[in-house]
């Protein structure tokens, strides 16, 4: 990957991975099925609990990165939750589902994708929260990740 991957392609991959992770959390559907829906150009519609509108049709999307994020988060969600838990002031089951998806995605990148600077991970999570989560969720996500970063990112 390295320098040849454009930031916009990674940003799109994160956005679609977040939506796919959220879909998985809601439906508990097989990750391969969710991935296939996104690769076929579908996006999860929360209101209808079904896939809707084009997803990976964005002109620049790092599909390999999307797959890594989605599969990695789903397969390691229990471990990721244990890394998030110490930095959250309320029970994990009380977290908004989108906030949980954001934190899992960012924690996966912080712990498994050392090629991505932790400040980039935090900034991208904040930007995704501003678009997809509740009004002040970006502040919560920023606080949790800021506290966690020095403890979970290997130097």
Curated annotation (Swiss-Prot):
Transmembrane segments: none
Alphabetized InterPro entries for the sequence: NusB-like_sf, NusB_fam, NusB_RsmB_TIM44
SUPFAM superfamilies named in the record: NusB-like (SSF48013)
GO molecular function terms attached to this record: RNA binding
GO CC, alphabetical: cytosol
Keywords in alphabetical order: RNA-binding, Transcription, Transcription antitermination, Transcription regulation
Paired cysteines (S-S): none
GO process annotations (BP): DNA-templated transcription termination; transcription antitermination
Keyword Phosphoprotein tagged: no
PANTHER family linked to this entry: ANTITERMINATION NUSB DOMAIN-CONTAINING PROTEIN, N UTILIZATION SUBSTANCE PROTEIN B-RELATED
HAMAP family per the UniProt record, alphabetical: NusB
Family: Belongs to the NusB family.
Functional description taken from the UniProt entry: Involved in transcription antitermination. Required for transcription of ribosomal RNA (rRNA) genes. Binds specifically to the boxA antiterminator sequence of the ribosomal RNA (rrn) operons.
Protein's UniProt name: Transcription antitermination protein NusB
